[in-house]
Amino acid sequence: MSFLSIVRDVRDTVGSFSRRSFDVRVSNGTTHQRSKSHGVEAHIEDLIVIKNTRWANLPAALLRDVMKKLDESESTWPARKQVVACAGVCKTWRLMCKDIVKSPEFSGKLTFPVSLKQPGPRDGIIQCYIKRDKSNMTYHLYLSLSPAILVESGKFLLSAKRSRRATYTEYVISMDADNISRSSSTYIGKLKSNFLGTKFIVYDTAPAYNSSQILSPPNRSRSFNSKKVSPKVPSGSYNIAQVTYELNLLGTRGPRRMNCIMHSIPSLALEPGGTVPSQPEFLQRSLDESFRSIGSSKIVNHSGDFTRPKEEEGKVRPLVLKTKPPRWLQPLRCWCLNFKGRVTVASVKNFQLMSAATVQPGSGSDGGALATRPSLSPQQPEQSNHDKIILHFGKVGKDMFTMDYRYPLSAFQAFAISLSTFDTKLACE
């Protein structure tokens, strides 16, 4: 009996338990008291069955070897869902998966929902694409499963919906493709702009590593041991990044210039041996919550206006990212950036982000729109983290854009930054 058939057997068994629990919950609407007690008994019975099943009692050494082989063999989606299915069998299997399956920073793979808020790979990039729906003002982020840019088959990751207000624009970001709202249990953050569309704040529902620097809920204690999204403190809006587009006061045509201050990432993260501190609450419950039904919670906004979070002297400086200045090609009369074939359509939205410590002011005359024609240059020697492109975004077709990111950005952060380029900018171009 192959291991994949075993996984399917276990998954079907767990699925039957879930369906039984669902049937019990549905019956609650008619006979509340009786159904409630019956539902508890059925739930306990299911837990006992799972706990006593032969799958939960496999020897640890055997289970570890099997999980390792599965993690190595099922390395891409959709086959990767077998690893997720194993983590949902029981607590023993879940803990084993948590120990074996590495974060994207070291594996380069997106496996569990928590991976969307973990830094990308250090030695590679994660290739994604964004599909825009102008009629519904929605944006969907997918993991690229094929090298072909225009192939519209991918693993869904995140979605966003734009809402225009009188003085600002807001993008709500969710892990659900259809239910995109702040009241949903899949809501994980938002992007908010000012009136001109030149400044954006990225808000996360979980505090960053330096949450003491970020405006926190007043007169409330914070506990991280509950099984809910937020035990005593409702999920809030924590300022983790600020995106600013430089004003174009002269009115000349040219590429946009963007600055990103990543409050949740220290500048030392790009130094040798540097790391991105994790969110204690979020990562502590992440894998368990991936397999539980998360109830919606009240939203508390303690984000403030477009001002920098309060910082004390001696605190770690945040990472600052800037757009890489393109080269002006006089024969083509266009701006040029090397996207290595990942961007094919010239657009003012196209950009590449790298550490501000290495960005030098570009030179050249004013000209047309930003082109994406790759420049032919000899292979460069190995780059340091400061010299590498951390995020690049560009157009490949009608309402289709590629988004590739790497360490230290996460998929959530890269998606939020990319969303800012879709907004109308009255004074930047």
Curated annotation (Swiss-Prot):
Q: Which domain of life is it from?
A: Eukaryota
Tell me one Pfam family matched here.
Tub
Q: What GO terms in the biological process aspect are recorded for it?
A: regulation of DNA-templated transcription; response to fungus
Signal peptide positions (record) = none
- Gene3D superfamilies in UniProt: Tubby Protein, Chain A
F-box domain: residues covered: 53-108
User: Which InterPro entries has this protein been placed in?
Assistant: Tubby-like_C (IPR025659), Tubby_C (IPR000007), Tubby_C_CS (IPR018066)
Feature: compositional bias, Polar residues: 374-383
What tissue specificity is annotated for this entry? Mostly expressed in roots, flowers and siliques.
State the similarity comment. Belongs to the TUB family.
The protein, known as: Tubby-like F-box protein 5
What lineage, starting at the top, does this entry show? Answer: Eukaryota, Viridiplantae, Streptophyta, Embryophyta, Tracheophyta
- Gene name for this UniProt entry: TULP5
